């Protein structure tokens, strides 16, 4: 273990060895190999980064908006050039297959593209005449130092909807990546620096509780963006808000997919397999529950079981692999416990992913549990793994009632060609992101990303116009300019 590389924090444009007395292994979940070690940094290191970020903000916020945008555009170009390298890093430390990793890199690039539009996004409003000789203008200004807390499941896409936009709008940023997937951030830092970002504007501090609490408590940090589990998200929102910070916390999900009798069978099965088992189910937009109308249920489920049993499982770097590992051994054990709990509570296990035949890594195969009811633990909890619950329903109205009982409301999908059914679904379902005849309704960067109920805490969502509002505050100037002396 002596030759394992120890990662460093990135503060004021330099890689700085941590003062941490504890390091955690960063593991390739497909093999169990230790890739490097990440410091569990101290609160003092976070506070040091905050001082640096505040100093950098004073200068960066005064840089002309088009010039800031050019730095973001250069960053975007570098990301494109290094797309394959970035994708391989994601697969190495996260486990998702290379095709999915490439897709994640592309979504990250699109987020940077959106942020590069800062000159337009920063525009305010004005009214030439609100009274005699009086005009008003509304200006946007950056809020200051921003903190970001990112999850392991999208080590590029999620950070890239945080720091590029915040920085393009004139803020400085401190990011705490997941300690499980920190390697990719090293490369992003390198490329952002190469793009011309001044020292101190973007800082990275690895760690756990002390760093999170530092972000939430340090008075220099004015806003916090979080993506992760519901319990941590609640804590982040309550603690950050109590310390008078802006907070957006995107948390758990239990996304429902409704399959109606007129759905295209082959297309629906393909989409559900991808949505339920892609990225090992470790995404907040995964399909966790299918509610299927009785008329199509037998044919749909027979085809779904066959497709699930034919999924290729393995190392995401290998050709043809669809399903990679879950992130850690404890996640694997937790998932198996949920499957067994479902069977214990009366669900029918029709596709069993507990045994994959793979001797190394943390794998769980596609799992389907049928005859699920809303009082079961597997229906209530976010499992965050390739486990799909199935409920048969009589009609669309029942399917919507089932979905709306969940405490989560991130996304929901429907498969049908009935326009009336689609409209009913759109109006009645409780969820922030909806899909029609597609499995993962994750919107593009210029639309807001986030859910309702226990899937989100805050008022301003990630991405879209909401992100511009989140990272800026407004100043309205009302002025009187008498035209006396200029009369014709």
UniProtKB/Swiss-Prot annotation:
What does it catalyze?
3-oxopropanoate + NAD(+) + CoA + H2O = hydrogencarbonate + acetyl-CoA + NADH + H(+); 2-methyl-3-oxopropanoate + NAD(+) + CoA + H2O = propanoyl-CoA + hydrogencarbonate + NADH + H(+)
Record flagged with keyword NAD:
yes
Query: Record's SUPFAM superfamilies?
Result: ALDH-like (SSF53720)
Q: Which residues constitute the catalytic centre?
A: 284
Q: Which domain of life is it from?
A: Bacteria
Q: For this protein, what is any one GO molecular function term? A: malonate-semialdehyde dehydrogenase (acetylating) activity
Keywords per UniProt? NAD, Oxidoreductase
Pathways involved: Polyol metabolism; myo-inositol degradation into acetyl-CoA; acetyl-CoA from myo-inositol: step 7/7
Disulfide pairs here are none
Any Pfam family matching the protein: Aldedh
Name the Gene3D superfamilies on file.
Answer: Aldehyde Dehydrogenase, Chain A, domain 1, Aldehyde Dehydrogenase, Chain A, domain 2
Protein EC: 1.2.1.27
The residues listed in the UniProt record as binding NAD(+), with positions renumbered to this chain, are 150, 152, 176, 179-180, 229, 251, 382
- Keyword Nucleus listed: no
Q: Name one GO biological process term.
A: thymine catabolic process
Similarity comment: family membership: Belongs to the aldehyde dehydrogenase family. IolA subfamily.
| Biological function | Catalyzes the oxidation of malonate semialdehyde (MSA) and methylmalonate semialdehyde (MMSA) into acetyl-CoA and propanoyl-CoA, respectively. Is involved in a myo-inositol catabolic pathway. Bicarbonate, and not CO2, is the end-product of the enzymatic reaction.
Q: How does it assemble?
A: Homotetramer.
NCBIfam families per record:
MMSDH
Q: What is this protein called?
A: Malonate-semialdehyde dehydrogenase
Q: Which organism is it from?
A: Listeria innocua serovar 6a (strain ATCC BAA-680 / CLIP 11262)
Q: Specify the taxonomic lineage.
A: Bacteria, Bacillati, Bacillota, Bacilli, Bacillales
């Amino acid at each position: 273990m002596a030759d394992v590389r120890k990662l460093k924090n990135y503060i004021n444009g330099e890689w700085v060895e941590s003062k941490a007395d504890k390091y955690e292994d960063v593991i390739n979940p497909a093999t169990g190999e230790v890739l490097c070690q990440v410091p569990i940094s101290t609160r003092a290191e976070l506070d040091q980064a905050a001082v640096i970020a505040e100093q950098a903000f004073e200068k960066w916020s005064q840089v002309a908006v088009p010039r800031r945008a050019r730095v973001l555009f250069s960053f975007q170009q570098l990301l494109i050039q290094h797309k394959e390298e970035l994708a391989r890093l994601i697969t190495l430390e996260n486990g998702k297959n290379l095709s999915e990793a490439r897709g994640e890199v592309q979504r990250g690039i699109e987020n940077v593209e959106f942020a590069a539009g800062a000159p337009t996004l920063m525009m305010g409003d004005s009214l030439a005449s609100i009274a005699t000789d009086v005009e008003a203008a509304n200006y946007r200004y950056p809020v200051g130092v921003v903190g970001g807390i990112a999850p392991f499941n999208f080590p590029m896409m999620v950070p890239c909807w945080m720091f590029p936009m915040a920085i393009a709008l004139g803020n400085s940023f401190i990011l705490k990546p997941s300690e499980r997937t920190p390697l990719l951030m090293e490369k992003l830092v390198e490329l952002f620096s190469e793009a011309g970002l001044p020292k101190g504007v973007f800082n990275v501090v690895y760690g756990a509780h002390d760093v999170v609490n530092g972000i939430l408590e340090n008075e220099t940090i004015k806003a916090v963006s979080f993506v992760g589990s519901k319990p941590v998200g609640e804590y982040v929102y309550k603690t950050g808000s109590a310390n008078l910070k802006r907070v957006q916390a995107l948390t758990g999900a239990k996304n429902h997919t409704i399959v109606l009798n007129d759905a295209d069978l082959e297309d629906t099965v393909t989409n559900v397999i991808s949505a339920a088992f892609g990225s090992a189910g470790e995404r907040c937009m995964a399909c966790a529950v299918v509610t299927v109308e009785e008329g199509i249920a037998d044919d749909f489920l027979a085809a779904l079981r066959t497709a699930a049993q034919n999924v290729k499982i393995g190392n995401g770097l290998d050709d043809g692999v669809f399903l990679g590992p879950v992130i850690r051994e404890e996640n694997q054990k937790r998932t198996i416990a949920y499957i067994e709990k479902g069977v214990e509570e009366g669900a029918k296990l029709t596709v069993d992913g507990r045994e994959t035949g793979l001797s190394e890594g943390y794998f769980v195969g596609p799992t389907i549990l049928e005859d699920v009811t809303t009082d079961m633990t597997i229906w209530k909890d976010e499992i965050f793994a390739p486990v799909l619950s199935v409920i048969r329903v009589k009609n669309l109205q029942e399917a919507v009632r089932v979905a709306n009982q969940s405490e989560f409301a991130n996304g929901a999908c429907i498969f049908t060609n009935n326009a009336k059914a689609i409209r009913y679904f759109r109006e009645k379902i409780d969820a922030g992101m909806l899909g029609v005849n597609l499995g993962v309704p994750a919107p593009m960067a210029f639309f807001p990303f986030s859910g309702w109920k226990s899937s989100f805490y805050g008022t301003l969502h990630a991405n879209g116009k909401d992100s511009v509002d989140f990272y800026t505050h407004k100043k309205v100037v009302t002025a009187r300019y008498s035209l006396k002396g200029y009369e014709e």
